Amino acid sequence: MRIEEDIKLGFKDVLIRPKRSILKSRSQVDLTRLFIFKHAQNKWSGIPLIAANMDTVGTFKMAIALSSFGILTAIHKYYSYLDWKKFIHTIPGTVVKHIMVSTGMLDEDFVKLKQILSLSSKLKYICIDVANGYSEKFVTFLKKVRECYCDKIICAGNVVTGEMVEELILSGADIVKVGIGPGSVCTTRAKTAIGYPQLSAVIECSDAAHGLGGQIISDGGCVVSGDIAKAFGGGADFVMLGGMLAGHKECEGLIFKENKKRYMIFYGMSSKFAMDRHIGGVARYKTPEGKTVKVLFRGAVSETINNILGGLRSTCTYVGAFTLKELTKRTTFIKVSEQENIIFNNQEVSN
């Protein structure tokens, strides 16, 4: 047993200090990024946000909506091959290039992955997604996928420490997904005591990844657009969103009415609800590590995205960053004991 004495930080523990700026308008800020990936050597340009590969968020409809903004969607792994075939043959290539194909690490997952990727050469992203990216089995599977697809951009995770980020990049990952337990419907930290405050994880993991020419995704923990700005300020190359995109018409959660209001079911992918739906229940040796909640139905996702992008542009303006890439260099975090004045938070007038 050992104890690390330094305090690790989450998004709620900091604010970004404003700095002098010569920007005259938020409209001058460019949020697009251009990446050339370490192993695949492919280029990608767009706004580096990603809809999470949760079955209510990472949907085909979400991919179509977000592609118009130049934003990625990690399509969840529960669509069938026939679902994929129908989808790929009915959408333009501009949508396909903003899609990640998600997979687990079972043998049948690999077979299905190969079938899906055979549908279009424009499918460039693979997202190998497991809850615990620290297992040797996961690293072995990553190497197997890289050997088979030398030209694909591979994202792998989840981990939260620099040494494992390095291991995954050296084993074939172009991008490493960072985050254990920060998600809005994740209970891993409560159930297992395992985790790492997200901002510190991003800062440490981005340092490790960038030293090897890789990138990271900050996955989880964002509640407002300011949290996304903090993730980018801390060194994240991409930010993945689940709860912030839940409840929209492009999602596939169950919709119901309660007290004359419309709600949508949203749940973690390790929740009992998800396991009952996809694998026939919770195995006797497991415990659910996610919760099921109701969120207000919010209509089209486009308005939410515009609000997020507006917040990011404003952050950049406050610190004098003309581009999103500059934000990390312009960021100085200050540790705080408060974030905002919440006195009227429950008394807002609906538009």
Swiss-Prot record:
The organism's superkingdom is given as: Bacteria
- Give the binding site residues for NADP(+): 108-131, 216-239
SUBUNIT field: Homotetramer.
Reactions performed catalytically: IMP + NH4(+) + NADP(+) = GMP + NADPH + 2 H(+)
Enzyme class per UniProt: oxidoreductase
- PROSITE patterns recorded: IMP_DH_GMP_RED
Q: What is this protein called?
A: GMP reductase
Give a yes or no for keyword Hydrolase in this entry: no
One example of the protein's molecular function in GO is: GMP reductase activity
Is the Oxidoreductase keyword given for this protein?
yes
Name the EC number(s): 1.7.1.7
**Keywords assigned by UniProt?**
Metal-binding, NADP, Oxidoreductase, Potassium
Which InterPro entries does UniProt cross-reference here? Aldolase_TIM, GMP_reductase, GMPR, IMP_DH/GMP_Rdtase_CS, IMP_DH_GMPRt
Functionally, this protein is described as follows: Catalyzes the irreversible NADPH-dependent deamination of GMP to IMP. It functions in the conversion of nucleobase, nucleoside and nucleotide derivatives of G to A nucleotides, and in maintaining the intracellular balance of A and G nucleotides.
- The entry's active site is 186 (thioimidate intermediate)
Would you identify the family this protein belongs to, as annotated?
Belongs to the IMPDH/GMPR family. GuaC type 1 subfamily.
**GO CC list:** cytosol; GMP reductase complex
GO biological process assignments: purine nucleotide metabolic process
Which of this chain's residues are annotated to bind K(+)? 181, 183
The UniProt gene name for this protein comes to guaC
